Amino acid sequence: MAKTLYEKLFDAHVVFEAPNETPLLYIDRHLVHEVTSPQAFDGLRAHHRPVRQPGKTFATMDHNVSTQTKDINASGEMARIQMQELIKNCNEFGVELYDLNHPYQGIVHVMGPEQGVTLPGMTIVCGDSHTATHGAFGALAFGIGTSEVEHVLATQTLKQGRAKTMKIEVTGNAAPGITAKDIVLAIIGKTGSAGGTGHVVEFCGDAIRALSMEGRMTLCNMAIEMGAKAGLVAPDETTFNYVKGRLHAPKGRDFDEAVEYWKTLKTDDGATFDTVVTLRAEEIAPQVTWGTNPGQVISVTDIIPDPASFSDPVERASAEKALAYMGLQPGVPLTDVAIDKVFIGSCTNSRIEDLRAAAEVAKGRKVAPGVQALVVPGSGPVKAQAEAEGLDKIFIEAGFEWRLPGCSMCLAMNNDRLNPGERCASTSNRNFEGRQGRGGRTHLVSPAMAAAAAVTGHFADIRSIK
């Protein structure tokens, strides 16, 4: 029987399945951070259980860390407690930890792939919704809750029901300046923020194959923003070349044998999907969200929509509420909307290619008066590589702030946040009310578009900036 990639990955990891019971899956990798793990470790301690597979468990600090100093106290008392608990728990249970002073420390979904912890064919979980990022490698990766974190620590397994399957095919070739971020925002604009609910999404088509691994990670990172359980891209030579030689990747003959298996990880001819969505890459322009969910998105050349133009009463009411929160008026061109802050970072867009794209725009220009612009590399290795290439100097000379690695202003759990009423062009993944700070107004864009907003003081079409 022909199978989809998701069905192959799921079936390969079933440990036990009985009639009328949820299947039990084996988990190959468990990624841990300071926010969703303390109670899970406490649960192990209370029942005198060890971590079953400490060698398959990797921890880092990211959500709470300050991006201005390595001082554990800098983001407040709650942050300090969570980070100190992670240090204590990893020491006690034998889990490898990339702490504030470790050269590999960074955002968990940046660290995993760059260290070769993430490999094709794996099941990967983390107490974080954007675990879907790792699906870019042809791995079944999804976020879990704290009680499930404890279950995986204790058993290296997890009960999971089968999801529905969705194929999203992006045909043709994207125009110059159009990035993975624009593609995924255009997809979510078409499906809506709940269009993938109950599904695991496989992204395919010529435009997807043309993406680098970093672009594919951006794509899968935001699968969750259309309501999907996970996102997948079938592994290919691009994947294998990225993985080869990384710290935790197989070596020598083991790598060659792994590649032979990884090549089988693709949807069979004749396999059927529950839902199919198609987009044409050449029709995708630079995208900017205007509302308070990622599905409220338009091209940068469009005008702010009128809620009256929505036929669905729920969408109309949502648009009215979003415009009121965002302080926007229907009919205003997006390029007339001024911004206060710019955030280039997050598990969506903080890798070296993202920083190069932003630096290309920033080079020889200056951040507009009254705008604060932050560049936050996703990890220690990304920061080191950017500095080796001189990107930090380009940003600093242009008036951007060059920060230490961390989740930063994506989620306002640290000391980087928006003040009430401030408008931000952000490369992160969520534009919900208050996501970047109470009363903050978030517009999601690509790194190049964020840099363009920083130097012009408003949203600008990257295609017109030479």
UniProtKB/Swiss-Prot annotation:
One of its GO terms (molecular function) is 4 iron, 4 sulfur cluster binding. It is an enzyme of class 4 (lyase). Pathway: Amino-acid biosynthesis; L-leucine biosynthesis; L-leucine from 3-methyl-2-oxobutanoate: step 2/4. [4Fe-4S] cluster binds at residues 347, 407, 410. Its EC number is 4.2.1.33. Pfam families: Aconitase. GO terms for biological process: L-leucine biosynthetic process. Keywords: 4Fe-4S, Amino-acid biosynthesis, Branched-chain amino acid biosynthesis, Iron, Iron-sulfur, Leucine biosynthesis, Lyase, Metal-binding. The keyword Glycoprotein does not apply. Binds 1 [4Fe-4S] cluster per subunit. The keyword Membrane does not apply. InterPro entries: 3-IsopropMal_deHydase_lsu, Acnase/IPM_dHydase_lsu_aba_1/3, Acoase/IPM_deHydtase_lsu_aba, Aconitase_4Fe-4S_BS, Aconitase_4Fe-4S_dom, IPM_dehydratase_rel_enz, IPMI_cat. Its cofactor is [4Fe-4S] cluster. It catalyses: (2R,3S)-3-isopropylmalate = (2S)-2-isopropylmalate. Catalyzes the isomerization between 2-isopropylmalate and 3-isopropylmalate, via the formation of 2-isopropylmaleate. Heterodimer of LeuC and LeuD. Belongs to the aconitase/IPM isomerase family. LeuC type 1 subfamily. This is 3-isopropylmalate dehydratase large subunit. The gene is leuC.
